Amino acid sequence: MVRRIASATPMVQSPMSPLGTTYCVRPNPVSLNLQRRPLVIASTDEAKVTIIYAGLLIPGDGEPLRNAALVISDKIIAFVGSEADIPKKYLRSTQSTHRVPVLMPGLWDCHMHFGGDDDYYNDYTSGLATHPASSGARLARGCWEALQNGYTSYRDLAGYGCEVAKAINDGTIVGPNVYSSGAALSQTAGHGDIFALPAGEVLGSYGVMNPRPGYWGAGPLCIADGVEEVRRAVRLQIRRGAKVIKVMASGGVMSRDDNPNFAQFSPEELKVIVEEAARQNRIVSAHVHGKAGIMAAIKAGCKSLEHVSYADEEVWELMKEKGILYVATRSVIEIFLASNGEGLVKESWAKLQALADSHLKAYQGAIKAGVTIALGTDTAPGGPTALELQFAVERGGMTPLEAIKAATANAPLSVGPQAPLTGQLREGYEADVIALEENPLEDIKVFQEPKAVTHVWKGGKLFKGPGIGPWGEDARNPFL
């Protein structure tokens, strides 16, 4: 087995730390060389069979199982069922066994922003003032925290997720699976515009027709006007590695001067965005608040709607008829209400207060109507993402089992055909699995305590558990 070797020294831990044990990671001098390697490359002759025994197994979709077992063979779930029914061939070839109180699929957050700047919500201006290297460092830390907290997948809907995903996938950093839109597409004077800056400054940095020599077109926002510009904008995001396309189809809260009730982009522009994405086997996710934008996004063929603050029965029936996913993002609203708008410009704070009640009624209405829902927070990697499960239950009206389904089994729908088989504990699915020390069906807030997440497997590899170091290495024998 080839490994990048690091020594991990526990540091002083604050009782209030959201991270659990904090480590100082430094390279081992014996392992230093000039060739960058993946963190872990397993040899082909390893057995790679893991058996996990669980007092309670929550499959993601379906009823929980008592006294269950799950077998991971390589990266795939090979068996799920009663521990008495484990095929003997796995018992003979077991590499490792674990016994845990609760086992379930890894969590998803389906509405992240990989901005990595220190003041994202202040009218987006800090995004242009923050060096991408600083953004990358913050995002690396946040992605590590996310995995430790039980989040094995993120959908990024405006940010550097495409670039961070490459670093995670090649083993440079540790984090969840990341499915990114790249930049969110906005019209001029739309939700992705930066009204506090001169138009030339914004268009020079984020305008789709203005990529400079050596410029990757890799920012969190992309301004495009007219059918040819939006077509190019979609193609640029796919070139960058986008797995889903994000469009601002109405005004928003954080954009200082637009109106959340007004639709953005013309029907022709939206149609081209959806068609161009579909040509590359991608779905389109639409930011929408007001009904005009909601209906335009539905008509254009968007398959995932975010926020949907001013919806009614007509909207819910259309979403069910067309198989459209709803991601409510209640957390960001609750967080700002609780802080009295701390960090927001006054215009954004006024808009958030104006739509908060309507958004909650819409969320509750969607749940009662049976709309398919996935959970997302509209926050940054490593943030308080587990709050969304609590709000789904306590504010939205879901049962804990329904909230878990929305955070696991439903979540891959948010990236359409680009999603692998994951989000459920089923045979043939990727082994993105977490273990808990307490039952979330009895207390949904258990996800907010990182220590309650005792084990995390991503793609069959154990990244958190007894004897596992901060980089997913075997801390008991790091030289293997």
UniProtKB/Swiss-Prot annotation:
Reactions listed under catalytic activity: ochratoxin A + H2O = ochratoxin alpha + L-phenylalanine
GO BP term, pick one: proteolysis
CDD domains, per database record: Met_dep_hydrolase_A (cd01299)
Swiss-Prot/TrEMBL domain comment: Each subunit of the homooctameric enzyme folds into a two-domain structure characteristic of a metal dependent amidohydrolase, with a twisted TIM (triosephosphateisomerase)-barrel and a smaller beta-sandwich domain.
Regulation (activators, inhibitors): The Zn(2+)-specific chelator 1,10-phenanthroline inhibits the enzyme activity.
Function in brief: Carboxypeptidase that catalyzes the release of a C-terminal amino acid with specific catalytic activity for aromatic amino acids such as phenylalanine. Is able to degrade ochratoxin A, one of the five major mycotoxins most harmful to humans and animals that is produced by Aspergillus and Penicillium species and occurs in a wide range of agricultural products.
Main location: secreted
Top-level lineage group: Eukaryota
Protein name as it appears in the record: Ochratoxinase
pH-activity note: Optimum pH is 6.
